[in-house]
From Swiss-Prot:
<dbReference type="GO" id="GO:0019684">
    <property type="term" value="P:photosynthesis, light reaction"/>
</dbReference>
<protein>
    <recommendedName>
        <fullName>NAD(P)H-quinone oxidoreductase subunit 2 A, chloroplastic</fullName>
        <ecNumber>7.1.1.-</ecNumber>
    </recommendedName>
</protein>
<comment type="similarity">
    <text>Belongs to the complex I subunit 2 family.</text>
</comment>
<dbReference type="Pfam" id="PF19530">
    <property type="entry name" value="Ndh2_N"/>
</dbReference>
<feature type="transmembrane region" description="Helical">
    <location>
        <begin position="57"/>
        <end position="77"/>
    </location>
</feature>
<keyword id="KW-0150">Chloroplast</keyword>
<keyword id="KW-0934">Plastid</keyword>
<comment type="subunit">
    <text>NDH is composed of at least 16 different subunits, 5 of which are encoded in the nucleus.</text>
</comment>
<keyword id="KW-0793">Thylakoid</keyword>
<keyword id="KW-1278">Translocase</keyword>
<keyword id="KW-0812">Transmembrane</keyword>
<feature type="transmembrane region" description="Helical">
    <location>
        <begin position="418"/>
        <end position="438"/>
    </location>
</feature>
<comment type="function">
    <text>NDH shuttles electrons from NAD(P)H:plastoquinone, via FMN and iron-sulfur (Fe-S) centers, to quinones in the photosynthetic chain and possibly in a chloroplast respiratory chain. The immediate electron acceptor for the enzyme in this species is believed to be plastoquinone. Couples the redox reaction to proton translocation, and thus conserves the redox energy in a proton gradient.</text>
</comment>
<feature type="transmembrane region" description="Helical">
    <location>
        <begin position="99"/>
        <end position="119"/>
    </location>
</feature>
<dbReference type="InterPro" id="IPR010096">
    <property type="entry name" value="NADH-Q_OxRdtase_suN/2"/>
</dbReference>
<dbReference type="GO" id="GO:0048038">
    <property type="term" value="F:quinone binding"/>
</dbReference>
<feature type="transmembrane region" description="Helical">
    <location>
        <begin position="124"/>
        <end position="144"/>
    </location>
</feature>
Amino acid sequence: MIWHVQNENFILDSTRIFMKAFHLLLFDGSFIFPECILIFGLILLLMIDLTSDQKDIPWLYFISSTSFVMSITALLFRWREEPMISFSGNFQTNNFNEIFQFLILLCSTLCIPLSVEYIECTEMAITEFLLFILTATLGGMFLCGANDLITIFVALECFSLCSYLLSGYTKKDIRSNEATMKYLLMGGASSSILVYGFSWLYGSSGGEIELQEIVNGLINTQMYNSPGISIALIFITVGIGFKLSLAPFHQWTPDVYEGSPTPVVAFLSVTSKVAALALATRIFDIPFYFSSNEWHLLLEILAILSMIFGNLIAITQTSMKRMLAYSSIGQIGYVIIGIIVGDSNGGYASMITYMLFYIAMNLGTFACIILFGLRTGTDNIRDYAGLYTKDPFLALSLALCLLSLGGLPPLAGFFGKLYLFWCGWQAGLYFLVSIGLLTSVLSIYYYLKIIKLLMTGRNQEITPHMRNYRISPLRSNNSIELSMIVCVIASTILGISMNPIIAIAQDTLFSF
C-alpha cells in the first residue's frame, strides 16, 4: 500500500515537471527560435549519418550551413524587438545579445567551407566534426543570452567541452593530443575559478542567481562594497581572463593553436572570444556595477600586459599558427578598451565593430594558412618564402589579411582600431590608448616581415616545400578559396563603408 502511494506521488510529480517544461517550451520557445534551428540541424545530422552511406556527405555540409544561415535569418527578423526575459528569468533576448549571437553564427558559417577539403584530405570523421561545431555554436549562443549564473555556467561548459573535443580531433597526432590535454586542464581550472567567484557573488547577494536580482540582493544586504565582492571580482576576472587568453593567463593558447587542426583553430580563435566578451560585458556591467573602478583597473592591467607580451613574443615565432596565437592575445587587449569605455562613449559599439572586422581578417588569414598547409604540409614561416612566384593569388590574399590585422590604411583593421582607440581617448584612457598605438605599430613589423618573405624570397631562402609547391590556377572551385575571397573582400572594403556598421552597433539597446 505504501509502495502504491509512493508510486502515485512519483507519477504526479513527474507529470507536473513534464507539464511545466512543456509549458515553458510552448510559450517561451519562440525566444530561442534561432537556437532551436541549430538543435533541429543537430538531430537531422544524426539521423542522416545513421541511415545513409558515405555518398551523402555533401548533405551533411549542406544541412550544417543551412542551419547557420536560417539561424542568422531568424535573428535578423527578430531585430529591434522589445527586450524580453524568458524561461523563468534564465534567458534574456535583446539587440545587444543578438549582435554577439550574430557574430558567432557568422564565424561558424564561414568555418564550414574552410573545413571541407581539410577533412577530406586528413580523412577525419565528418559527422562528429560538424556535430561539435554546431553544439559549440549553440553553447556560445546560449551564453550570450544567459541571464543567471547557472545558465551561464552550463552554456559555457557546453561550449568548452566541444572546444576540447575539436582540439583533439586528430587523435593520431601527438601535438593535437598534447594541445587537448593542456586545453582541458587549463580550461577546467579556469571554469573552477570562475564558479568559485560565482559562489561569492551568490552568497553576498543573499542567494540570488539572476544577474539583476544579484544587484538588488547586494543593495538589500549592504554587501556591494564588501570584501566578498572584491574576492568574487578577482576570481571571475581571472576565469574570464583564461577564456579570453588575456596575459598572464594565455599560456595554453600557443600550444592549442599549434597542435589543433587549423579549421578548428580558425573557429575557436573567434567564437571563443566573442562568447567570452558577451559574458564579460554582462557580468562586469550588471553584478559589479558598484565596483566599476575596481574592474576597470583590473581590465586595464590585463589589457596592457596582453598588448605588450602578445606582440613582443609574436616577433620571435617561427610557426605561423603560433604567431597568430600571440597576435590574438594582443588583439584581445585592444578589444578590452571597448569594455572599459562602456556604453556611454561608444565603447561597446567600437568593440562590436572591431570584432566584425576581426572575423574577416582572422578567418581570411587562416583560410590562406589552410590552403598553404594542404599544398605543402607545413606552417613554418620560412617555408612561405617566394610564395608570390608560385601562387600570386594566395600570396596577395594573405598579405592583405595580415596588413589588415596590422591596422594599415585603407583596410578594415585600420578603421576598426582607429574607432576603438578614438573611443578610448574620448573616455580619458590616454595611457591605455598610447600603449595600444605603440604595440599596434610593433605588430606591423612582424606582419611586414612575413609579407616581405612572401613577395621577395631569394633563391637561397626558398625551402624544398616551396620548390615542390603545386601551382594552382588563379581561382579554383574549392570551398576554402571561396571563404578566403569573401574574407579578403570584407577585410578590404568594410572599413571604407563602416558608418552603417557603427550606426547599427550604436543602435543596440543595452537593456537588461
